[in-house]
Amino acid sequence: MAQFFKAKPNQAKKLSQKIALKVQRLDHLGAGIAEHQGKVVFIPGALPGETVEVQLTEQKKNYARAKLQRVSEASPDRQTPPCPWYGKCGGCDLQHLSLPRQLEYKRQALGDIVSRSAAQTVTVNTDEVSGDSWHYRRRARLATLLDKETNQLALGFREEGSKSVVGIDSCAVLARPLSELISPFATLLNRLKGKQRLGHLELTQAANGLFAVLRVTAPLAQSDKKLLSAFADERQIALLLQGNEGELEFLSSGHELPYYQLDGLKLAFAPGNFIQVNGEVNQAMVAQAMNWLDVHAGERVLDLFCGVGNFSLPLAKQGAEVVGVEGVPEMVAQAKQNAAINGLDNLSFYCADLSEDLAAEPWLGKIDKLLLDPARAGAYESLKWLKKMKPAKVLYVSCNPASLARDSVLLFEAGYQLTRLGLVDMFPQTHHSEGMALFELVN
């Protein structure tokens, strides 16, 4: 017999009541933290020092969650978010906090989590890598939303904590040329006969122009392709269709791959290849990595999770003998092409799953320096082989401070000391950040 949950009267009353709280600090996801009846309460949108009126939405044994209803006493660091979809769209969650305080919060969060793994207080450099705080994204993936009642299609991003899509016509953190394409693209897609066959739309600003990849779940009619092609040529963008198997079809006149420029180098990438979305910060991040690692001609440097060569090529340009390793075959092939495009012959690339046993890999051996730029899961398995590699310096670029903190324990156990730690503000207006850590062998 099925049993249905029914909230107890007292519990329902507790959740519906509004209470006033004093916010103490922010958590690692950017939510305000307060205390109520001995419990920690998480309040998205609230800032430290504020007195807020909230409604409890969830009660657990040791904590509760609440929805911000009203700010009674605002923090001097609070600002009005310029985005009309702020609070609905799940993209930016710190637009209400001034940029200097965003950076301070991220430095503190990075230092706190790494300090716990180091079992000592770690100082984060105050000269963080940062750039423009608005219109900085050179790539974005927009979801499509087709209203079954009106048969109207909208483009947008996922709603916070939901699979629902919030329709938008511009984006304050997307590069202006891309933001200005959202509304015209939505109008165009609504003219297509096969608009029910459309998936996401990926927009990219490259050094050689604007690129759009439209995902389709079934082939489009020729008349639809003509509309798309005319739109692309009129706006001078490269437009590609991507089918279920990942196959690409150019609908525009230009067939050149997108590329970006870095340290005088040209790095091409295919749609679907990972690149850093913040081009300005990526430039500064790579420059800082070169400075911290201090590579000299002839040194053997291993670049794990190398992608299309974002760090490998600048390292090779400095005269190092570089070995790049990446788990995606297509990106390994692109990295090799990028080396050839730039006339660099002092580097080699290998494809390997860096989460598996690396004992038989031909590239695993003594090196002078190691650079890692893993995905959010980190590089725990790779770092187990430190004793075989014995690099004098390890530079770890992390998009997940929690993974960096966990992995740093392996470095400490292997005799390394954390000598520099810096914030890389790749994603302004959000709680997300990257960290750069330099470890040096003590003995």
Curated annotation (Swiss-Prot):
Active site per database record: C399
Known EC number: 2.1.1.190
Organism superkingdom: Bacteria
InterPro entries per UniProt: 23S_rRNA_MeTrfase_RlmD, MeTrfase_TrmA_AS, NA-bd_OB-fold, SAM-dependent_MTases_sf, TRAM_dom, U5_MeTrfase_fam
Keywords: 4Fe-4S, Iron, Iron-sulfur, Metal-binding, Methyltransferase, rRNA processing, S-adenosyl-L-methionine, Transferase
Record GO terms (molecular function): 4 iron, 4 sulfur cluster binding; iron ion binding; RNA binding; rRNA (uridine-C5-)-methyltransferase activity
Residues annotated for [4Fe-4S] cluster binding in this entry: C83, C89, C92, C171
Gene3D superfamilies in UniProt: 2.40.50.1070, Nucleic acid-binding proteins, Vaccinia Virus protein VP39
Coiled coil: none
Biological process, per Gene Ontology: rRNA base methylation
One matching Pfam family: tRNA_U5-meth_tr
Domain TRAM span(s) in chain numbering: 12-70
Function: Catalyzes the formation of 5-methyl-uridine at position 1939 (m5U1939) in 23S rRNA.
Family of this protein: Belongs to the class I-like SAM-binding methyltransferase superfamily. RNA M5U methyltransferase family. RlmD subfamily.
Protein name: 23S rRNA (uracil(1939)-C(5))-methyltransferase RlmD
Organism: Shewanella amazonensis (strain ATCC BAA-1098 / SB2B)
